[in-house]
Amino acid sequence: MPRYKLTVEYDGTPYVGWQRQENGHAVQNAIELAFKKFCGEDLTLSAAGRTDAGVHATAQVVHVDLTKDWGAGKVRDAVNAHLVMADERVSILNVERTTDTFDARFSARARHYLYRIHNRRAPLAVDYQRAWWVQKRLDAEAMHEAAKRLLGEHDFTTFRATQCQAKSPVKTLDRLDVIRNGDYVEMRVSARSFLHNQVRSFAGSLMEVGVGRWTADDLQAALEAKDRKACGQVAPPYGLYLIGVDYAFPY
């Protein structure tokens, strides 16, 4: 069966997350239904990142096996047409044929996320549900310096959800940068894989540094505590974006 690699963009606001669930409409549901209307097949998609409810993506990666050998452009345009007709907030940006051994999840070498904080006194209008609104002025430089304490391999128990199903809390963090961009404070983070709620836990804890309630040493102590109770608040999902996934090429 021909395998296809899809790059997908979506607004996570109306969805219960990426993964198909019984309690609501998921991004996976939306795309699988569009494929069903296109080719008449009941398909199961596999994604690089199983984003939570409200989390957005500009470059989610998915693979799917089809019975017929369709042209990549035909797949993209036909599935997008059905997504538009269904009023879904999902777009297939690119489709390419790939090898049978490519797996969107398990072949990934790195995942890249962006967390956006809208940092001004006035509330959000255009970017409502697209960024976390924090009124108090944040010291982005202090946040960036503190974030260096989290780089490398650590036991990130403090920064993972209590219901996280990962076998080990140990992960290697390759990048964690914080910069100010006008009224926004942006956190960019990269690793091969992440724990459940890890990025949002970083954002909430670094916000504590930004407003002056925590120092870099406090963040270090939270990391070393290996205790979920030591974490700062978990930032809301709507500020988080999956912005890229890296693979070895050729697949």
UniProtKB/Swiss-Prot annotation:
Protein's recorded name: tRNA pseudouridine synthase A
EC assignment: 5.4.99.12
One Pfam entry name: PseudoU_synth_1
GO molecular function: RNA binding; tRNA pseudouridine(38-40) synthase activity
Superkingdom, natural source: Bacteria
Protein family: Belongs to the tRNA pseudouridine synthase TruA family.
Keywords: Isomerase, tRNA processing
CDD domains to which the protein is assigned, alphabetical: PseudoU_synth_EcTruA
Chemical reaction(s) catalysed: uridine(38/39/40) in tRNA = pseudouridine(38/39/40) in tRNA
Binding site for substrate: 113
Function recorded in the entry: Formation of pseudouridine at positions 38, 39 and 40 in the anticodon stem and loop of transfer RNAs.
Source organism of the structure: Brucella anthropi (strain ATCC 49188 / DSM 6882 / CCUG 24695 / JCM 21032 / LMG 3331 / NBRC 15819 / NCTC 12168 / Alc 37) (Ochrobactrum anthropi)
Signal peptide (residue range): none
Subunit structure: Homodimer.
InterPro entries, per the entry: PsdUridine_synth_cat_dom_sf (IPR020103), PsdUridine_synth_TruA (IPR001406), PsdUridine_synth_TruA_a/b_dom (IPR020097), PsdUridine_synth_TruA_C (IPR020095), TruA/RsuA/RluB/E/F_N (IPR020094)
Catalytic machinery residues: 52
HAMAP family given in the database record: TruA
Leading EC class: isomerase
GO biological process: tRNA pseudouridine synthesis
